[in-house]
A protein has these predicted regions:
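Amphipathic alpha-helical coiled-coil segments
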Residues: 24-39, 119, 123-142, 153, ...
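Metallo-beta-lactamase
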Residues: 189, 244, 402
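Acidic, low-complexity, intrinsically disordered peripheral segments
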Residues: 57, 208, 398-433
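Solvent-exposed loop segments that connect transmembrane elements
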Residues: 65-71
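Periplasmic alpha-helical coiled-coil/stalk elements that build and connect Gram-negative outer-membrane
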Residues: 10, 122-238, 343-346, 350, ...
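Bacterial Sec-pathway N-terminal export signals of envelope proteins
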Residues: 3-52, 58, 91, 208, ...
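Small/polar (Gly/Ser/Thr/Ala-rich) solvent-exposed segments
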Residues: 23, 46-64, 75, 79, ...
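Hydrophobic, lipid-facing positions within transmembrane beta-strands of outer-membrane proteins
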Residues: 83-87, 235, 295-301
Length: 433
């Protein structure tokens, strides 16, 4: 591997620090941890103190006085200071709605954690996909360049033969057509690799100078990983139990269930213990220059009787949403199982496919050599040679694609069962040089 080549592990640690989608998930998890604290607060004591101080108060008081059957209005002016202090502590003793909200808040914290883990898993898959896309495209570029060199040599040879009177314009035109098509494909591949590089650069927070900085697929024998467990039913069982999207769907369903209980609590009474203390001086117009102190301890009971049918409607609504979340969970499970089976089939049949493509490449090489000899002997035309070269070119492309398809399928298989980690990244990294 060149000293400057960037490995998948290098990009993995950079992506953890710089990928904006994953960093958003980190903050979502931090925010989600507070759900439980918010829910618990509704079951804990509530203490409040109110203080009011008015150093200057003015009052004008006018009242009539009867003097010898005459009414006289007397006016008095007062300037006084007033203050009041109130302290209240309350503790819920029975509040079914608040308790249901607390249980929901615990599940919301678990849901936020599941979302974080799922985003982390998706980060690894996106990194592998983008890395493979760059590596795969650069392999196709190398094949394309090699094919162009072959066509250019054949074109030069055919032009010399034509000048000597042994070649034909048809051969030259056929080669030029193949060459121009290959050059057009090369331009498309350059755009494709630039797009893949930009996606990868966005994840790691820095621009990749050139695609040559990505390690290439190794030239050594491509060794498939053993599937452990080796039966699909166990993979399916593990996915149903551990898949992060399925876990999140279960949490969503549990939250919807608690929403039903929260609305059910609107039918129940609430009971609170409370204690209050107040101290005041001239707190109102009728208590000027009077000081009061009072303390109260007791229970507060509230019983809902009728609220226009709101609670009943909310119960029906939350029940429907709970049923909806159950169907959404089932849909997610079905989709995951379909994808799991598809990726499992790719992994389990890749050895057959790779052997077939390797044999196809070997056969195409033999056919090309035989066709070239026959062309020299006058038994085949230049078109036959070009077709044989095209067949080899396609077989090599199919072989490379099958290798990358296997790597992606193997990674997805472990993502669906929540077993994709740095160790799996190291295994994938070993396929590149």
């Amino acid at each position: 591997m060149p000293a400057s080549a960037v490995t998948l592990s290098d990009l993995y640690f950079l992506a953890i620090k710089h990928d904006p989608t994953f960093n958003a998930a980190v903050k979502e998890q931090v925010a989600g941890k507070e759900y439980e604290n918010i829910g618990l607060s509704q079951l804990l004591p509530n203490i409040s103190i109110n203080y009011k101080n008015n150093p200057r108060n003015w009052q004008r008081k006018a009242y009539p006085i009867n003097i010898f059957q005459d009414k006289i209005t007397t006016v008095e002016y007062q300037n006084y200071q007033s203050y009041s202090v109130n302290a209240i502590i309350s503790q819920p003793l029975f509040d079914y709605t608040a308790f249901s909200e607390y249980k929901a808040s615990i599940i919301k914290t678990l849901l936020a954690d599941s979302h974080y883990q799922n985003k982390f898993s998706e980060l690894i898959i996106r990194l592998i996909d983008n890395y493979i896309q760059v590596a795969y495209t650069q392999d196709k570029l190398l094949l394309n360049q090699a094919q162009q060199e072959i066509y250019q040599k054949q074109l030069a040879s055919s032009q010399r033969l034509f000048e000597l009177g042994e070649g034909t314009k048809t051969d030259i035109a056929e080669i030029e057509t193949r060459l121009y098509l290959t050059q057009s494909q090369y331009t498309d591949l350059q755009l494709e690799i630039e797009k893949a590089k930009n996606k990868l650069s966005a994840m790691i927070g820095s621009q990749l100078p050139t695609h040559e900085h990505i390690a290439k697929l190794t030239d050594t024998k491509f060794v498939l990983q053993s599937l452990a467990p080796d039966d699909y039913s166990t993979w399916e069982k593990n996915a149903i139990q551990n898949n992060l999207k399925i876990q999140s769907a279960r949490h969503e369903m549990a939250i919807a269930k608690q929403e039903i209980e929260k609305n059910r609590g609107e039918f129940f009474p609430t009971v609170q213990f409370y204690a209050a203390y107040s101290s005041s001086n001239s707190d109102s117009n009728n208590t000027i220059n009077q000081k009061y102190q009072s303390a109260n301890v007791g229970f507060y009971v509230s019983m809902p009787l009728f609220n226009g049918g709101k609670t009943t409607a909310s119960m029906r609504q939350s029940t429907a949403k709970y049923q909806m979340s159950a169907f959404e969970r089932d849909a997610i499970i079905q989709n995951i199982m379909q994808e799991l089976r598809y990726q499992y089939q790719i992994c389990s049949t890749s050895h057959i496919k790779l052997m077939a493509f390797e044999q196809a490449v070997s056969s195409a090489k033999l056919q090309l050599n035989a066709t070239r000899k026959s062309y020299i002997g006058g038994q085949r035309t230049m078109v036959d040679v070009l077709n044989a070269e095209e067949l080899l070119y396609r077989a090599q492309q199919d072989l490379i694609k099958a290798k990358y398809d296997y790597i992606q399928a193997w990674a997805l298989l472990h993502q669906y069962t929540n077993t994709l980690d740095i160790e799996k990244i190291k295994i994938i990294e070993n396929y590149f040089q």
